[in-house]
């Protein structure tokens, strides 16, 4: 079920539903996570890291959604440690780090799957259409608004796909608590 592409003696693997796991780190996000989860194709694996000991929250997610694994941490690990925990639990080559208040458009992942053909990358990140969160700018300061691939110096953490093979198990710095 994996798609491989050959170009100049190099093979690249395309992201697919089968080789992607979406990781969502949350702390008592019942009020927003349903919108996020319903925006994700039910066939895609999902790992929820709940930074509390709220067993009812986890139970309700498991009852409502398929292809979901939930882990209670018992305490607030923060984003870095929580994402590392989720990545460690994933069995796929690619992981998407997604904030619980992010809603994917219906075609977002299919467009990313298509763009990943013939592409060697470490991180892919979609553009946001939320006016409160402006998109990337080029080094010249020009706002990016199109659908083409482009390189950036940094990505926003609300939604990003990582190729685990490019990171040698060095994902997020756990000394940086980030926010939660």
Positions of the model-derived regions?
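Acidic helix N-cap motif at the loop->helix transition within catalytic regions
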Residues: 34, 54-63
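A conserved acidic beta->alpha catalytic loop
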Residues: 39, 48-58
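Donor nucleotide-sugar recognition loop
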Residues: 169-180
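Short, well-formed alpha-helical segments that are part of the catalytic scaffolds
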Residues: 24-42
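Conserved donor NDP-sugar-binding/catalytic core segment of glycosyltransferases
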Residues: 102, 106-137
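A recurrent flexible, glycine/aromatic-enriched loop bordering the glycosyltransferase active site
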Residues: 144-162, 177-179
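Glycine-rich, basic loop-to-helix element that forms the pyrophosphate-binding segment
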Residues: 73-90
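Short aromatic/hydrophobic "clamp" motif used to bind/position activated sugar donors
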Residues: 95
């Amino acid at each position: 079920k994996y798609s491989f592409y050959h170009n100049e003696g190099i093979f690249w693997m395309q992201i697919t539903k089968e080789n992607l796991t979406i990781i969502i780190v949350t702390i008592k996000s019942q009020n927003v996570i349903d919108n996020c989860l319903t925006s994700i194709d039910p066939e895609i694996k999902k790992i929820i890291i709940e930074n509390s000991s709220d067993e009812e929250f986890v139970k309700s997610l498991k009852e409502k959604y398929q292809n979901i694994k939930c882990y209670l941490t018992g305490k607030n690990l923060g984003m870095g440690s929580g994402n590392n925990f989720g990545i460690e639990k994933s069995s796929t080559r690619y992981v998407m780090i997604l904030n619980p208040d992010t809603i994917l458009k219906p075609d977002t992942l299919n467009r990313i799957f298509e763009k990943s053909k013939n592409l060697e990358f470490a991180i892919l990140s979609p553009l946001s259409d939320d006016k409160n969160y402006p998109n990337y700018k080029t080094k010249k300061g020009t706002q990016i608004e199109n659908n083409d691939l482009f390189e950036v110096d940094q990505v926003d953490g609300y939604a990003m796909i990582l190729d685990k093979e490019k990171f040698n198990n060095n994902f997020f710095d756990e000394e940086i608590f980030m926010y939660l």
